[in-house]
Every structure is written in C-alpha cells, then in structure tokens.
A protein has these predicted regions:
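Beta-sheet repeat architectures centered on beta-propellers
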Residues: 2-13, 19-188
C-alpha cells in the first residue's frame, strides 16, 4: 500500500492504494482496478507525505475512499472514491473530491459516518492545550442533509458540481433526448 493506512477490507475483499495504482484482493488473486482518474491522483500526490494517506469505507453507498495530500500540502486535502457496489470491469465508477478528512468512522459504529478534518489556519475554540501548535480539527457528521452546519450553528449550502470527460451518447442511450438534423449536444 502507499501508506500504512492505505488499505481497507470490505466484505472479505481487501482494497488498497499502491504506489502506482489501485488494487483489490478477493481471496484468490490480486486485481488491478481500472481507474480513469489515476493520472489525476498520482500526478499531484505528495509522496513525501504519503504516511497521511488513509482508506475509509462508506457502506451506505458502497464506496471506498482514499484521502491523500496533494503536492505542496503536508496534510490531507483531497480524496478519490471507488464505488465497489456499482462498478463493473468495463465501467468502473470513480470520483475525485476536495473532501479532506483526516479520520473516518464508518456507519455501524454510529448511525452515520463521522469524520474529522484538520486545518493549519483554524484556531481551536476549546481551552488551550499546552504544547500544541497552530491548527484545529473539525468533527463532522457525514451523510446528513445538504447543508453544512458549523459548531456555532451557522448553516450554509454545500457547494457542489459535476464535471465529466467526453463521452458518446449512442443511438440506444438517448432516451429523453431528441436530435433533429445535424447537431451537437454539449452539457456544461
């Protein structure tokens, strides 16, 4: 694995982020996971801080996520997620995100996943801990609504968007879309 905590077991299958790719072991053999975002992840991975990489499972959606630091960051600031439940070898489902979580506790321990994030610029709101340097962690309840609620109770909508690479819509896949004459269909 890319780090001591870069592997995780889900339903008898081990998944891990290696130094050059993603893999799984199903009890019989090791399989390389086809990944369309692999270059995006590895070209900006801070290998000097790879001990920060850790894997997490979200059984609510059938996902394994690896949280990792990018080049120029000593702390986790990005994630890559593999959907093991809906992926098939010909169509693996991967997503990338700036979701930065330094710890993760899956549902099962509690009703929903809980996680923490670390910020070097935040100031703790609890009594001073002797010997601690700057920075603070935030404790998050995941998968609860569509708004972010801070410790002070302030609520804001979670910023979200979807970005995709090019793909073809073939004749049998265009339900709900009507093309008339020569045309080009772009979604942005």
């Amino acid at each position: 694995a890319a780090s001591q905590h870069g592997a995780i077991e889900v339903d008898g299958i081990a998944y891990w982020m290696g130094p050059t790719g993603f893999f799984k072991f199903d009890g019989g053999r090791v399989h390389s996971l086809p990944c369309l975002v692999e270059d995006y992840v590895y070209e900006d991975l801070n290998t000097n801080a790879n001990q920060q990489i850790h894997a997490a499972v979200n059984n609510l959606f059938g996902e394994v996520t690896w949280f990792y630091p990018t080049e120029g960051s000593d702390y986790v600031d990005r994630s890559v997620t593999y959907n093991y439940m809906e992926s098939v070898p010909q169509n693996p489902i991967w997503t990338v995100s700036s979701l930065a979580r330094t710890t993760w506790s899956p549902e099962g321990v509690y009703a929903k996943p809980y996680a923490t994030s670390y910020s070097t610029s935040e100031v703790p709101t609890v009594p001073t801990v002797q010997g601690a340097t700057g920075g603070a962690s935030t404790y998050w309840e995941q998968e609860k609504g569509t708004d972010e609620v801070t410790a002070t109770g302030a609520t804001s909508a979670i910023a979200a968007y979807v970005e995709s690479g090019d793909y073809d819509i073939t004749q049998d896949q265009r339900e709900g879309i009507t093309f008339k004459g020569d045309s080009e269909f772009m979604m942005r």
